[in-house]
Amino acid sequence: MKALRDFLDQMHPKFSKGGKLEKLYPLYEALDTFAYTPGEVAEGKTHVRDGMDLKRLMVTVVIALIPVTLMAMWNTGYQANLVLASKGIATVEDWRGAAMAAMGLAFDPNNFLSNFVYGALFFLPVYIVTMTAGGIVEGIFSTVRKHEINEGFLVSGLLYPLTLPATIPLWQVALGIIFGVIFAKEVFGGTGKNFLNVALASRAFLYFAYPAEISGDAVWVAVDGYTAATSLGLAAAEGVSAIPFTLNQAFMGDITGSMGETSVLACLIGA
């Protein structure tokens, strides 16, 4: 870590006022404050003086989301493997199937690792696209407005994928988060000034712009051509008695739905 600290200190003059890379200072500052404690401290008549800064608060929220994220990956793989096993399908002809084969994993719903890895192959691309597309927009606005890149996007960038179905097209993932960052956050001035939730605004945009990929019965299980309604969908269409899941399943989270919405237990652990 000392080597990184020395490197950042050496680069600081180039990004400071008058330096060759002055316009890119927000990008430098984002890396510096992500790795180390921000150099600025509260001054003046602040209401609270505390060791907790925005970075620590946001990192705390990210840590709280870890149980839900892990459950999202496991349950996504479990629901898919459950269907594949019931239909006698042993291979999947896409890059995820090739990755599973390369790791020597079968599509077995009784295998924890198989479920987790297969689910991760759906969740991680969504997360990576979210962080890349949203991060670029954040960087552009910070550079133009000459203000720091806040850690709040780390939270939005994790919440957003958790609200999506596993089958969502990646280009829609990018489009949704770009819309959310711009119109739910940056137009109001950025972190601390926006009254809309970036993750939910992004999802709402996709819901109204591309309803076929984010609603209905065909998007909740990551198996081509398979349909399965959510509990809310079944209750609305046929009544509560039509829900096939037990209360224990609903509490634990091994039911269909958006990747991060199914487990009450995981949410409570994070809370």
Where are these regions (language model features)?
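N-terminal signal-anchor module of multipass membrane proteins
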Residues: 1-123, 127
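C-terminal ends of transmembrane helices
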Residues: 43-48, 133-146, 182-192, 269-271
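Short, amphipathic, aromatic/basic-enriched membrane-interface segments that mark the entry/exit
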Residues: 52, 121-124, 139-149, 165-168, ...
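Hydrophobic alpha-helical transmembrane segments
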Residues: 58, 62, 124-128, 151-155, ...
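Hydrophobic core segments of alpha-helical transmembrane domains in multi-pass membrane transport
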Residues: 61-75, 131-138, 162, 178-182, ...
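Structural signature of hydrophobic alpha-helical transmembrane segments
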Residues: 116-130, 167-176, 236, 255-264
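A generic, well-ordered mixed alpha/beta core segment in the N-terminal half of proteins
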Residues: 150-220
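Long hydrophobic alpha-helical segments that form multi-pass transmembrane helix bundles
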Residues: 189-268
